[in-house]
């Protein structure tokens, strides 16, 4: 098998090849890439057009109903209206026999709503699935956890970190988008259905608070009500061990729905539990945050993400420096790259303005039709997982001349051979709502890894290009190196994954922090060991 065939085989195994656009548009994956979320605006615009036509039709129908109402009312307001008049008597009987029936069973009303329903059914297949709602809700919980966001603030559209009594504004949107009681209920219910009461309770509490404030108002788009929120919150508190709160909320529920026998039985049950063991069940239980999947480095990872890439103490280290880099290559002599060395062991460098705006845009445009849900290696299988939320596509070097130029620039800057099969095709990634990639290595850590099927060794280096900027979040966190690098538009981040001995460098454990606000795009060029023997020779020291 030739080098090119081996590379193609690897990408087929990874299930991340250039792909099929129709497969890329699978329902249930909208939340996993911001570009897919943006595409969901198109069907909603079509729905708005349908609703506008429906409203216009209903306005005309209501004007006609108002005319009919005023006409009949005027007859009833005149107490002297003589029913002895055969004309009036006839019209009265006609109204009661046919006019009112026509009004109540108006064909116009049914035609208006039928047109709206038919239009909805035509675009329904293009709408996000329930799995997208679940994914978006889990994304809000992820942001809540990693950035220590206050749920009440989020419901008001404010991104605030709360630590004890201190409140820090992480991001101030130009326009506030507040959530409704029904919005908060749906987030809480996703957690509730997973048995995750740590997240369910604050969201359901906010739902109850908002529903209380608007009780009696009817909103046609709402699926839930105050009673629904009280019901779920009461049971969540009970499962969390707080019977006192469960009882209080259940009693409030019965004020609104006194005939609910199930809730009445719950009240009796909670009262009995409190009477039997008041000291045990009155005290508010401490609810542990779930750690699924188990992540040993979670606290370090989240602490680095919370810096949002701002770590000024790094710039006090004398051995770190900035320079104009040519790598003694003629290709870069007339246009050197601005280089910022941000860590030495492992070696990590940031190259500013590595690509232009037009190049970044072109790469995004080339990749967008082929984006598919990102997967991770699990043994010899490739799986979609909750700890990696993004979509990705692979672009062959020959797809566009700009990619050829990009490869020449990477090769000139790194001094490495980036031609297939010594390097993989360019992987372009678009992150989703709260998109992230929890701590991982880029190099293979198992002999059974699909990476070895390229027959070109392990991934010796990573060259990651930021193709966009973000408003907040999305930093690249190096866990054991204890630093995070913010998203810098058009810059490229480079690091060695392997020591010169060929052993993996455990200090390169890194993560993509959740995107708080913004649309994050990156492009990865992974360079393999083979082909670099004389470009990065081995060392007698295993630590080099």
Swiss-Prot record:
Cofactor-binding details, from the entry: Binds 1 Fe(2+) ion per subunit.
A cellular-component GO term for this protein: endoplasmic reticulum
Pfam hit, one: P4Ha_N
Enzyme class: oxidoreductase
Keywords assigned: Coiled coil, Dioxygenase, Endoplasmic reticulum, Glycoprotein, Iron, Metal-binding, Oxidoreductase, Signal, TPR repeat, Vitamin C
TPR repeat coordinates: 227-260
Protein name (Swiss-Prot/TrEMBL): Prolyl 4-hydroxylase subunit alpha-3
Annotated residues for binding of 2-oxoglutarate: 520
């Amino acid at each position: 098998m030739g080098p090119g065939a081996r590379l193609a085989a690897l990408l087929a195994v990874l299930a991340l090849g250039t792909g099929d656009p129709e497969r890329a548009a699978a329902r249930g994956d909208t939340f996993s890439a911001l570009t897919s979320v943006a595409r969901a605006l198109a069907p909603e615009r079509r729905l708005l057009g349908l609703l506008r036509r429906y409203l216009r039709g209903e306005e005309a129908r209501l004007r006609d109903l108002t005319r009919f109402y005023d006409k009949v009312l005027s007859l009833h307001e005149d107490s002297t209206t003589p029913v002895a008049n055969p004309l009036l008597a006839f019209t009265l009987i006609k109204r009661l026999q046919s006019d009112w029936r026509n009004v109540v069973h108006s064909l116009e009303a049914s035609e208006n709503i039928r047109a709206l329903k038919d239009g909805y059914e035509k675009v329904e297949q293009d709408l996000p699935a329930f799995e997208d709602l679940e994914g978006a809700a889990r994304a809000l919980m992820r942001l809540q956890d990693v950035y220590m966001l206050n749920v009440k603030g989020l419901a008001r559209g404010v991104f605030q970190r709360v630590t004890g009594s201190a409140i820090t504004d992480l991001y101030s949107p130009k326009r506030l988008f507040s959530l409704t009681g029904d919005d908060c209920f749906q987030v809480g219910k996703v957690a509730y259905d997973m048995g995750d009461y740590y997240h369910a309770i604050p969201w359901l509490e906010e739902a109850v608070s908002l529903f209380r404030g608007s009780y009696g108002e009817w909103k046609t788009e709402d699926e839930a009500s105050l009673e629904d929120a009280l019901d779920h919150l009461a049971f969540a508190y009970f499962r969390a061990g707080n019977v006192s709160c469960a009882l209080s909320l259940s009693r409030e529920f019965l004020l609104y729905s006194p005939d609910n026998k199930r809730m009445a039985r719950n009240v009796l049950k909670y009262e009995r539990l409190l009477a039997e063991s008041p000291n045990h069940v009155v005290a508010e239980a401490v609810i542990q945050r779930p750690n699924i999947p188990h992540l040993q480095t979670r606290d370090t990872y989240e602490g680095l993400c919370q810096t949002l890439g701002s770590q000024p103490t790094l710039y006090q280290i004398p051995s770190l420096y900035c320079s104009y880099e040519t790598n003694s290559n003629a290709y870069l002599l007339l246009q050197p790259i601005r280089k910022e060395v941000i860590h030495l062991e492992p070696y990590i460098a940031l190259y500013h303005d590595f690509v232009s705006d037009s190049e970044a845009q072109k790469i995004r445009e080339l990749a967008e039709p082929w984006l598919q849900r990102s997967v991770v290696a699990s043994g010899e299988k490739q799986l979609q997982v909750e700890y990696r939320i993004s979509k990705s596509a692979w672009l062959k070097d020959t797809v566009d001349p700009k990619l050829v130029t990009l490869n020449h620039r990477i090769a000139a800057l790194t001094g490495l051979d980036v031609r297939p099969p010594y390097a993989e095709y360019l992987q372009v990634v678009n992150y989703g709502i709260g998109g992230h990639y929890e701590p991982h290595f880029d190099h293979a850590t198992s002999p059974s890894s699909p990476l070895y099927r390229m027959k070109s060794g392990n991934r010796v280096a990573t060259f990651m290009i930021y193709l966009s900027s973000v408003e907040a979040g999305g930093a690249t966190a190096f866990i054991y190196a204890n630093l995070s690098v913010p998203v810098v538009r058009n810059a490229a981040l480079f690091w060695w994954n392997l020591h010169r001995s060929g052993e993996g460098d455990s200090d390169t454990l890194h993560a993509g922090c959740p995107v708080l606000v913004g649309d994050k795009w990156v492009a990865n060029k992974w360079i393999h060991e083979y082909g670099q023997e004389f470009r990065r020779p081995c060392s007698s020291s295993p630590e080099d």
